[in-house]
Amino acid sequence: MAEDAAEDAAAAAVEPATRPAAGPALWRLPEELLLLICSYLDTRALGRLAQVCRWLRRFTSCDLLWRPIARASLNTGFTRLGTDLMAGIPVKERVKLSQNWRLGRCRDRILLKWRYSQMPWMQLQDASLYLSQANFILAYQFRPDGASLNRRPFRVFSGHDEDVCHFVLANSHIVSAGGDGKIGVHKIHSTFTVKYSAHEQEVNCVDCKGGIIVSGSRDRTAKVWPLASGRLGQCLHTIQTEDRVWSIAISPLLSSFVTGTACCGHFSPLRIWDLNSGQLITHLGSDFPPGAGVLDVMYESPSTLLSCGYDTYVRYWDLRTSTRKCVMEWEEPHDSTFYCLQTDGNHLLATGSSYYGLVRLWDRRQRACLHAFSLTSTPLSSPVYCLRFTTRHLYAALSYNLHVLDFQNP
């Protein structure tokens, strides 16, 4: 892939600024008409046309031609609504890379190892990776290839007395949930750290958007907090969930939030609450078996969200159509718990399972799993506690190590 990009760059450097005067009359049509004609071509036809001459190579590399193809491909940086999240990278290059995701072509490497079993969580931001280890959050810098790290962390965030269970990045802050029942607020670019008692038992999950923090705990409550520095620790709402709260997420509209609970004390593991009043708005689904706890939940848009957990399903919910029935679901073929999920905002779904460090890739337009990667052997079987991906790499955090699946240089 890197060689292809270098070849394209070298060719572009010597290409003429204008189209050739000789040749078929077709090439002398206005560019608008040529773009319209070429828009009917698929990936293979565009690639062959690019081999005709240097001018056509440049012309067929136009983002306008590749954008519809990219929107139908896996993990090209386009959301379902067409928003381009990676405008600085040529669309053609992203479509090339997408083929590796579709075909499962990648190379597995171990980025970090640790001596004792952990339950790590991680987040990505720009060229940095944030990883929880015991009661610390470590910040690592990626090397330029994105497939390796500087082994020494450039920042260490501390403050919890027990393990960090979960954390999120919120603009210039890290908000962490600890096994000590406390929430920690750390400024990324300074030494500012505050922690406060939030729950009677461990805080299993936390989210932060728009200056509001929500947290969920083993003590069967969810709470709403302000992020403002002068009001840290002042609880705005306490919600009795009647169940352990495993996961939590704030709606992009900042009007509500969803809790994923253990489904032991209450019949519904997915409930949506009003962020301003703390009142129940609705619950999602019906007929969940006891113990069908939701371990991960995420909003994809204000009206759509995904959930996964102990009942071995990933479910896609659209609040505009129904709150009682999901619009799509994907089942773990080996009846394993889903610990975590991540999407590209469009067609690609990645999940982490409870055994053998199993990462699965799914094309959301079909029910069957696209590819599966086992990152551990039987003696060291581990859940995938957290995974994140970019258009080039997928990172998976296991009990004893951090893996990267490199799709750029398979």
Curated annotation (Swiss-Prot):
Organism, scientific name: Mus musculus
GO biological process: cartilage development; embryonic digit morphogenesis; limb development; positive regulation of mesenchymal cell proliferation; Wnt signaling pathway
Protein name per the record: F-box/WD repeat-containing protein 4
UniProt repeat feature WD, residue ranges: 159-196, 198-235, 289-327, 333-372
Boundaries of every F-box domain copy: 23-69
Matching CDD domains: F-box_FBXW4
Function text: Probably recognizes and binds to some phosphorylated proteins and promotes their ubiquitination and degradation. Likely to be involved in key signaling pathways crucial for normal limb development. May participate in Wnt signaling.
Lineage, uppermost ranks: Eukaryota, Metazoa, Chordata, Craniata, Vertebrata
Classification via InterPro entries: F-box-like_dom_sf (IPR036047), F-box_dom (IPR001810), SCF_F-box/WD-repeat (IPR052301), WD40/YVTN_repeat-like_dom_sf (IPR015943), WD40_repeat_dom_sf (IPR036322), WD40_rpt (IPR001680)
Top-level taxon of origin: Eukaryota
SUBUNIT field: Part of a SCF (SKP1-cullin-F-box) protein ligase complex. Interacts with POUF51.
Keywords: Developmental protein, Repeat, Ubl conjugation pathway, WD repeat, Wnt signaling pathway
